[in-house]
Structures are given as C-alpha cells and as structure tokens.
C-alpha cells in the first residue's frame, strides 16, 4: 500500500513544506476524529482536476461509517462537487444524505468538508463522515464539548494555524481524547471536564469538582514540585494570552503521575480558550521504574560475572607461569583466552540496556590479545572486514567463542613454522536473515584427508558443538581459492532451525 508521501509525490507537485504540513495534519487528525465521532478522508487535487484520497482516519470514540479503505481512490471532480468547490473557494461546507444523490458519497451519512490551508493555498480538503441521525440528534455534555473543540480545530486547520510544526513529535505519545479532556475558556476557567479527566484530578488529590474552577488555582496546590507547579502556571497563562504553544508534560501530584498535553485554540486571530488532554500514567510509570530496576540489576550481575571471570583468568595465567610442563602451560593459556572472551561479552552486556551485544566492538577488543596468548613466535596480522552487527545475549557469547576459537586455530596450525609472518581475516556479511562469517588465513591450506567431523582438536570440537547446539547454524571448511583456508560459518539472525551448507 502506498504511503502518504508516495501518493503526494505521484499525484501532486506540492512543495516540500506543504507536504510536511500534510504529514503533520495526519499526525494530529486522530484527535480530530475522536472529538468529532466521525471518519475523515484527506483529498488532494491533481493538475487535471481529478481528486485523489491520500489518507483515512477512523474514530476511537464511535462506530465508523466508511467501512472500505478509501486510500488511493481516484474520482472525477464532478463526482464530489462540494470537495471541488472547497478547493476552488476555500470555504467549508456540508452535504446531507439528500444532497449526496449526485455525489459519489451516497450511503446515507452526512459529509462535511473543510479546507487544509498552507500559507495562502488550499493544499488538501478533509471530508468528515458521520451518520445523518448523529449529526442531527441532541448531544450530551461530553459530545457537545468534544464537537465544539473539533470545530475550533477545523477552523484553525482552514486558517493554516493548526497543527503547529512543533506539535508533531509530541502528538505520537500524547493522551487521547478518551483518556481525559478539559476545555478552558479565555479566562482559564474549566468549562467542561470529562469523567476520566476528573478521575485523574482526584488521583492527584483534588477533592472538589473541576467545572467552574480556574484550572491554575485547582492544579498548582496539587503538584509536589514547586518549580514544576510554577512552570505549569506560567505555561497555562501564556497559552491563554495567545503567546504560548502546545506542550506535553508529566506532572507528579499526590502520589500520582499524569501526562498533560495543552492545545491553544486561536480562531480568526482571537483566543477562544484551550484544550487539555490528560491521562493517568501512574501505573505505567510504576512498571517503568520496575523495569529500570530490573535492567540495572541484570547489568550489575553481568558486571560481577565479568569481574569473577577476570579473576579466574588471572589465576589461570598465574598458574600457567608456574607450570613447567609445556603441554599443561599451553592448555592453561588456552583456558585464559576462552575465559577472557566470555568476560568481554559480559562486560559489553553490563553496559547494554537491551541485552544486545555489539559483536564488532567485542571482537575488536579480543583480536589484539590473540597473538599475546598464542604459542607461536611469528607475528600474525588479524583483520576484520565487514560488520557483524548486534546479537541477543543468549547467542552472542557462543558466537564470540566460535570466532575466537577459529582465529586461534588458524594462528596455531595454519602456517608453516618457518614462515616469517601470516594473516588471518574475519569477513562478515549480514542480511535480514543471515549472518555469514568467513575466517580466512593465507597459510598452508587443509591437510590432505582432513575432516572437520573427525577432528580430535578440542577447539574445533567446541566450535562444532556451539554452532549446532547454541547458534542453530552451519559450519564448513575448505581450501581458499588462491592460498590458505576458509572456514565458513552461517548463523540465522532470528531463531531458526539448523541449516546445512
């Protein structure tokens, strides 16, 4: 399905600033749909006069009347005369069920049209769809307050003053109309507060009604932090004076945490009050704090495991120095390398907030010490080409162990003892599904008759076990094209069954 940007690029020649404004409108119009109890469609006009629907929104506060997906619909201008007239004249209008007989909208619901102005140009038209009976029947206090606010916002939309560019980001995580709605008059007095808004204020410690009370006078004594209370006071005053912009803020009061979003209502250059959306997020914040505490505990555990492993590595290193048996010393040094590799993974996890390990950072920290613990005297250059990316902690340790074992195996066994130097290269290529790693050396190549499955090397046995049991991956060894050996490792990025090369 085409996005709004794709449809605008395909059917219009609007400048980038106008396109950004339409994106901002779509970012805000869920609030419009909820306040109106109505569906909205956004129409643009092509150069040939044909109308194209580029976006659609359904209300959360009532039933939808547009049951089909209208996005991408292309209609002639004479099929929607009211929309075409609004593009030309820039004036809102309404079409009842009777008047729709000559229109493409003929399913018994009323349609109202509103221009979307950017600068001096009507860049789009919104059609609002609601049942004919709902548009005519007498509304309750909540519906009346919602619809009056929606009318003000639509007039601001027609004047090009809504939405404000700075409001787009905050709208994505703001309270919804159904969470709690407060309407202020020009003096800051609450003219309407929805039941959910009143409940949120009661959680904050209010013991009286909100309607008919100055919002600042009711709110300021409830807020725990005096600086925060002063900030809310100043913001609401600026909002009512027409000098302020909308704001999103969290307020702690009476042991509760509420999320507030303010919307200035300025119609025809005149301040007509403000709308406040409010949501009680006390339980959400409590869960957030619990998760933060849990994450901190997990990171502390990783930190302590890293410290313990480093202590074990230091003891093994000390024992290796005191051991006179060459074979025993080599085994201890290999153990030091393996323990150090695992310690580095836990070190990375102790600094991670999402249990994800940056494999490139860990590998780059391990590679410089590989030569130091090797039992060969010749210098071996070790390089990494490509990005390994990030992996979940469950498999990161296993993959790091596999790569370090393969590199160490190449350092120890791939080169002629008489060779002056050599090189080992780790090549990584990652797609959406796979992580492919090739450990290449420019040594002697595989011995004749060598079999990975029959090898009695402890390092390769560890590698085979980890690849099959922990990584659900596949492993193969082959002679390189020019010289040396390629060890080919393929690991699924997601959880998958075992694969064979």
UniProtKB/Swiss-Prot annotation:
Q: Give TM segment ranges.
A: none
Does the record carry Transferase as a key word?
Answer: yes
Cited InterPro entries: H_kinase_PdtaS_GAF_sf, HATPase_C_sf, His_kinase_dom, PAS-like_dom_sf, PdtaS_GAF, Sig_transdc_His_kin_sub2_dim/P
Residue segments, region GAF:
4-150
List the CDD domains hit by this protein, alphabetically: HATPase_EL346-LOV-HK-like
User: What Gene3D superfamilies does its record include?
Assistant: GAF domain (3.30.450.280), Histidine kinase-like ATPase, C-terminal domain (3.30.565.10), PAS domain (3.30.450.20)
Q: Which residues carry this modification: Phosphohistidine?
A: 303
Which one of the record's GO molecular function terms can you name? phosphorelay sensor kinase activity
UniProt activity-regulation remark: Binding to c-di-GMP activates PdtaS autophosphorylation and by extension phosphotransfer to PdtaR. At the opposite, autophosphorylation and signaling cascade are inhibited by NO, copper and zinc. Activity is not inhibited by calcium or iron. Full inhibition of PdtaR/PdtaS signaling cascade requires the transduction of a cell surface signal by the intramembrane protease Rip1.
| Chain intervals for the UniProt region annotation (PAS-like) | 179-291
Enzyme Commission numbers on file: 2.7.13.3
Annotated S-S bridges: none
**Catalysed reaction(s)?**
ATP + protein L-histidine = ADP + protein N-phospho-L-histidine
Any idea where the Histidine kinase domain is? 300-495
Per the record, a Pfam family?
A: HATPase_c
Keywords, in A-Z order: ATP-binding, Cytoplasm, Kinase, Nucleotide-binding, Phosphoprotein, Stress response, Transferase, Two-component regulatory system
Post-translational modification as stated in the protein's UniProt record: Autophosphorylated.
As for subcellular location, the record says: Cytoplasm
Free-text note on domains in this protein's UniProt record: The N-terminal sensor region consists of closely linked GAF and PAS domains. Binds c-di-GMP via the GAF domain. Copper and NO are detected through a dicysteine motif in the GAF domain.
| Quaternary data | The N-terminal sensor region is a monomer in solution, but it forms non-covalently linked dimers over time.
* Comment field (misc): Was identified as a high-confidence drug target.
Q: Could you tell me what this protein is called?
A: Sensor histidine kinase PdtaS
